[in-house]
């Protein structure tokens, strides 16, 4: 009665793992309940999920039982939809996925109606209801549904995948999956695909030397653009995968699949996935998934000049929790209206939606802004071509053609930038008041909260004044997919400011800076910003002599590390055990960036670039006045709420 086949993939929002864990908490509101740090009752487990606990899944009753089978834990019926049961019966998903694709192709070729023997797609339609942005994208990319069908959230369908990303720590598993399904070449329907080398960029150790070239050779032969050339025809690139995927996504109607939870592009809609789903997307150009509900996020008010856009991102989470009490983003699509920001800056928001526990996110952009973003994408793809990264199939050239076509459609008015219908239905609507954001915001792991469930989440957002300039900072880190070129320029500008006022700059804590891409480093060198970073650095990466082992000890200096994930990933290098780290990165989980010591818990707090830089210089969190002085004259962000326009309710153009 227990299904344990590794190829049975229950990766939709109702998968077994989330069903088991999300239904396992209860709030004791009795008078004798324990109160946590936020004056709320501590959440309690209904049953243990400690390592070693044994459960039995009864697939006939669709329920989870204890080891003895005499006590029901939770109902799992939502995980046993017809499509998933079909996978179980087949002993895995591959035969079903390929069978559906072959059958659809045959019917299209013969121009006959599809009468499938497989479980039909679940189609949900509400007459008179408009479409959210993600519903429009799914409708445009849906496969195996009747022509003219309109799909709303709750539908579960096959969709065309436009862009696929594989990263270097899960890529080996993806290659094994491709070999297992006897796939030898990428699907011709995939517009673009990239294999990164960013997660193992920090240290070129024995493991990386053994695995990375083998992975790159396989993926290059399969048809992906690869960060390293198997024949070393071009300089090895360790650019952060999400930045590259954001650049090669050249259509705001795209669906993107990537082997990482931060696959959350600011053009199109992107989903992080397991290695098997990535392999299927590469081999078939398809994925099967439900259309999630959407939460609409808009902004009002005006940003203070001393605030960074990262503070808007954190404030969104804080204001949402204050407005609703519970996290309304969880498992949903966040449809964020950031029309005035270019794709690079907008990605700072869409990327963080992983920490908001959203299923994915979609950025609503204005026509002129989207055109500028696509022009930037074109130029960066051309740089990849100039470096020799193009493959035999001319994938990068085709991406430029797609971008040019999309720009032409927007300019002519034939197909403007994607927007939702004004009568679309949302599960919730969040309005972020920019006037309420007057000081930097920090995401705190709250490692000593009496409620264990409240530790190491991203929901504890605190203003900098909370720390009274007394929070010791042992290491600062500016890097990860959350930052862009503007962030590294801010580091340089702050050093110049402090040099003018103090004569020199010294650090009371180590500051590690890792630009996410080589393009950024090259542009900073041309613009004169890299030289000020070099002036104060005690270490600068050297591609001719990469580090062979992880750094164990840090001095109070500026480190200019190789582009890539660096400390954010935590798989190669970490801060010293027990350190308090202040970083621009994404994760604050226990043991990720810093492990506990025998004397003190390690903690990774997350903040904006200027807060991290200043804290490393001071060795502590700054006062609000110290912060304002340090960023004076620096243009931290150009974000302003987009002006609402009358929307066309017609969805015919998808």
What are these regions (language model features)?
Residues 1-654:
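Fe-S-dependent hydro-lyases/dehydratases of central metabolism
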């Amino acid at each position: 009665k227990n299904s344990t086949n590794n190829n049975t993939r229950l990766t939709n929002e109702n998968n077994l793992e989330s069903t088991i864990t999300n239904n396992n908490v209860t709030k004791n509101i009795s008078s004798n309940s324990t109160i946590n740090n936020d004056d709320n009752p501590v959440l309690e487990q209904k049953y243990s999920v400690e390592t070693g606990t044994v459960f039995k899944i009864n697939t006939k009753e669709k329920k989870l039982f204890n080891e003895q089978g005499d006590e029901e834990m939770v109902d799992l019926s939502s995980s046993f939809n017809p499509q998933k049961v079909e996978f179980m019966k087949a002993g895995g998903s591959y035969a079903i996925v390929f069978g559906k694709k072959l059958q659809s192709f045959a019917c299209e070729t013969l121009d006959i109606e599809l009468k499938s023997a497989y479980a039909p797609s679940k189609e949900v339609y509400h007459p008179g209801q408009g479409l959210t942005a993600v519903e429009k994208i799914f409708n445009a990319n849906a496969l195996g549904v009747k022509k003219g069908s309109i799909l709303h959230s709750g539908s579960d369908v096959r969709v065309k995948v436009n862009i696929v990303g594989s990263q270097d720590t899960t890529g080996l598993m993806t290659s094994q999956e491709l070999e297992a399904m006897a796939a030898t070449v990428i699907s011709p329907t995939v517009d673009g695909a990239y294999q990164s080398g960013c997660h193992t960029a920090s240290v070129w150790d024995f493991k990386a030397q053994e695995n990375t070239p083998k992975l790159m050779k396989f993926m290059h032969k399969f048809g992906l653009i690869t960060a390293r050339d198997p024949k070393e025809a071009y300089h090895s690139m360790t650019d952060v995968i999400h930045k590259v995927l954001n650049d090669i996504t050249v259509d705001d109607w795209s669906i993107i699949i990537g082997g990482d939870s931060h696959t959350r592009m600011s053009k199109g809609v992107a989903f992080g996935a397991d290695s098997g789903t990535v392999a299927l997307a590469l081999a078939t150009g398809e994925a099967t998934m439900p259309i999630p509900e959407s939460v609409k996020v808009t902004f009002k008010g005006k940003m203070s000049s001393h605030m960074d856009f990262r503070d808007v991102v954190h404030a969104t989470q804080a204001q949402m929790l204050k407005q609703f009490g519970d996290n309304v983003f969880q498992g949903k699509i966040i449809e964020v209206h950031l029309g005035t920001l270019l794709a690079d800056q907008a990605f700072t928001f869409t990327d963080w939606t992983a920490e908001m526990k959203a299923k994915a996110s979609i950025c609503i952009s204005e026509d002129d802004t989207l055109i500028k973003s696509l022009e930037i994408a074109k130029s960066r793809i051309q740089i990849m071509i100039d470096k020799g990264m193009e493959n035999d199939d001319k994938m990068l050239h085709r991406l430029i053609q797609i971008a040019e076509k999309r720009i032409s459609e927007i300019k002519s008015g034939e197909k403007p930038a994607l927007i939702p219908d004004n009568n679309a239905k949302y599960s919730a609507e969040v309005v972020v008041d920019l006037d309420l954001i007057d000081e930097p915001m920090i995401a705190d792991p709250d490692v000593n909260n009496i409620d264990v469930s409240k530790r190491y989440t991203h929901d504890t957002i605190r203003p900098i004044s909370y720390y009274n300039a007394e929070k010791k900072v042992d290491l600062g880190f500016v890097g990860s997919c959350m930052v862009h070129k503007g962030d590294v320029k801010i580091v340089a500008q702050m050093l110049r400011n402090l040099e003018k006022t103090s004569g020199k700059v010294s650090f009371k804590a180590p500051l590690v800076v890792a630009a996410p891409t080589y393009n950024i480093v090259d542009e900073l060198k041309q613009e004169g910003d890299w030289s000020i970073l070099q002036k104060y650095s005690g270490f600068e990466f050297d591609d001719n002599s990469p580090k062979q082992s992880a750094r164990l000890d840090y001095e109070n200096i500026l480190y200019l590390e190789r582009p890539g994930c660096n400390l954010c990933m935590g798989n190669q290098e970490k801060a010293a055990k027990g350190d308090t780290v202040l970083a621009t990165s994404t994760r604050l989980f226990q043991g990720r960036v810093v492990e506990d010591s025998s004397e003190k818990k390690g903690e990774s707090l997350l903040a904006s670039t200027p807060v991290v830089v200043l804290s490393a210089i001071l060795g502590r969190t700054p006062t609000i006045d110290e912060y304002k002085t340090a960023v004076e004259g620096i243009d931290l962000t150009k974000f302003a709420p987009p002006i609402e326009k009358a929307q066309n309710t017609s969805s015919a153009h998808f």
